[in-house]
């Protein structure tokens, strides 16, 4: 696990050094740069790397890794060159295969396997990999290149599920790429312009769907994407992997599918335990993290894995949710693992600027602060790898919106006019025309469930991911940005993704596809990776092992949702390993009591960040509309806490990524403005 940076085009060695230094936090164990002049008129290429050593801790694992062609016997020192971030879990199997073909290896790293495999597979290389990765591989061979590859071309790849981040920017001088946006901003000719469409989408979802980012000149390739750089331009871009929804569902009973699921999860955890450093885990006491820890214990019965959990000081918890720590302690005692519990309070929100600096994007969710605290504690105690339970809700149907989708069976058959009769009053209630009832959880959820009843089926599915209605977020924009998104609802990128699975007509599976394709890749996995790397910790996600994901896509939706019971087959699979009260406990989000904090300890921070002066100067949001939203939220008349938080995050992000000059060496904000206001 590392940080990468680089370019193809007419850039300098100084820029490469600055870009690599900007991701220094991702790799405290070593660094390297490699500048390769173009042969035969090819554009120069710069590769930078920061190393977090996990497998083969020796100097042989240093990157960028350059080698003669392992297949053609060339004497060229840098026929092939690689900068790589991630882990390939099937690297040992691939290395055995390559050795049988005559390849000779000089290290125990998965990085070297990539170079050798490219020599055999060419552009089909990423299709052979099961892992988490983003890498750039330059082919400088005079001969023996794959079809469609010219000398000096660079293959740029992001893993199948978007577990590792990758950002790309095209400039007149060439293409820049890196693990984080802050590295790209070391190029002073890259414009720091906000993309109003991306901000509009961030208000809707609290995150921005790929390929956009909040910076107009920077994009993130979707999961499973490969790009071929040539002459300082993107010569080709293609998707080498698509989520396999729309296939024939698995045959067999629920019990048989549960048994196979249990076996596949154990295999995934065993693959992801491979490391030359200690491996621990997140443990919330929820089903997903508990299942991962149970499989860790099954794979290493004599070990006591170190696990980490978090709770809120003073008994304050997520609204409408049971506390996690009692369940985490119950699981730890049941499995015989070591639990390290952290407790935080409202002061944790003082980490907001630091969180946003590491996220690179204005994601409006306090959950990354929890992940950051856990990863920092783990690293202080010598841990370099943590396993996470991310992905279980997305693959097997664990979110409330999945139940709401199922509930549509009771009214979805109604004609359009009748559905409009449900939607109009629900939207009016959500817009503030109620008696302060939005503080009531049940009322709030019911209003949201019917607010988009009049939309077509796919648009209705997308709307379950929204945190506010179209009318509100349009009103929040200043006139210029509002004109830029005229005619758009924010649903467009997710609707475009749904077109990838035209053969999948099951409504639940279509929603689960969006969970994995966007909510995971653009939100959960982005913050999981970056909070871990901010702390020098690699976070692995066994539930998103490629073989397990392909299996989950074929599990019948009737086995995922049984009545109001989500993740039914997953729960059935874990019954032999975990206590029933843990398996069937109420769902708890990995977040924070944001409504209480915004109205209490964060009140002054809201006033400062969203002041009329700040907003008018920025020109993104309408100050009067924002003021009205803040007042309605405090009165309990709108479900607006996360929208207010999104507005704050966009403004704070702009101060760091748009206003501030690019530092020579990136450094975290020394003191957050939010912290000063609290």
Language model features with spans:
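Active-site adenylate/phosphate-handling loop in enzymes that bind or generate adenylated species
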Residues: 160, 373-434, 459, 524-548
